Amino acid sequence: MVTGVFAALGFVVKELVFLVSYVKNNAFPQPLSSSEEKKYLELMAKGDEHARNMLIEHNLRLVAHIVKKFENTGEDAEDLISIGTIGLIKGIESYSAGKGTKLATYAARCIENEIVITKGGCIHPSLIRFNIYGVRIHNGNFFHDKVNNCFFIFKSMPPLFVMNNEILMHLRALKKTKKDVSLHDPIGQDKEGNEISLIDVLKSENEDVIDTIQLNMELEKVKQYIDILDDREKEVIVGRFGLDLKKEKTQREIAKELGISRSYVSRIEKRALMKMFHEFYRAEKEKRKKAKGK
């Protein structure tokens, strides 16, 4: 769960909130013409911030369109819009006209990929995500994401798209099935004919050691960015994600401890995560600049 904190954010928190409000209220600027889009892409390539913002704002309707695909999954619409907006920003910033793909097509894929990768198996019936090492699946296909150290296990292998040297997964929505996948879903039978579920396959003698190693690695990442938060934000994030190596708490539990409302805890959590997202993105951008300079 800690890994999800590090979805790269390509925009400052204030701007992201502003963009999300656009989508929530369906207040979309008109799409750019081909000539306008080309002009702004050329200006953005030269470092023009206004051009970048224009490209993002005038493609916000793509976020609303993609989010509708996930409206029956039980996920919070505001969360999906926020994640989709991050995907749009990544798409705009990484787009290359020389690859022959239209900006809208590329951005739409990035939006859907961001939602699927961030939400994982709980959101899409064709994907199950496990943040665990050493898993062997005998029934089904799997893909190992080396960046986030997690496995993606598919009931049927979806198409893969390669963009900017990163493997991005574009999963076609299943029209007939829109229910969550449970770890207790049957995936086959053992030699005696007994039904085997996913949770049975994942059990191993070393799972406690494996989980501890992974958690410690992720905690080291979090420690790099948690100091930018104020005391209240730290308290909420530590409790919610179990960063003190204790049980993760619900927003309701934290609200009771702090004597505030659950909705206020939710706002604090989102604000804190956005701060961490932005700091992570800034740090990664600096790393890329240094790498290019070598």
UniProtKB/Swiss-Prot annotation:
Additional comment: The spoIVCB gene is an incomplete structural gene that is capable of encoding only the N-terminal half of sigma-K. The remainder of sigma-K is specified by another gene, spoIIIC, that is about 10 kb from spoIVCB on the chromosome. The intervening fragment, called skin, is excised at an intermediate stage of sporulation thus allowing a full coding gene to be produced.
Motif Polymerase core binding: chain residues: 79-92
The protein's name: RNA polymerase sigma-K factor
Domain of life: Bacteria
Propeptide segments, given as residue ranges: 1-20
Molecular function GO labels: DNA binding; sigma factor activity
Region feature (Not present in recombined mature factor): 114-165
Residue ranges for the DNA-binding region feature of this UniProt entry: 251-270
BP GO terms, sorted: DNA-templated transcription initiation; sporulation resulting in formation of a cellular spore
Stretch list, region Encoded by spoIIIC: 157-294
Gene3D superfamilies given in the database record: 1.20.120.1810, 1.20.140.160
Homology family: Belongs to the sigma-70 factor family.
Keyword Chloroplast among UniProt keywords: no
Family annotation (PROSITE patterns): SIGMA70_1 (PS00715), SIGMA70_2 (PS00716)
Gene source species: Bacillus subtilis (strain 168)
Transmembrane annotation, as ranges: none
Function in brief: Sigma factors are initiation factors that promote the attachment of RNA polymerase to specific initiation sites and are then released. This sigma factor is responsible for the expression of sporulation specific genes in the mother cell.
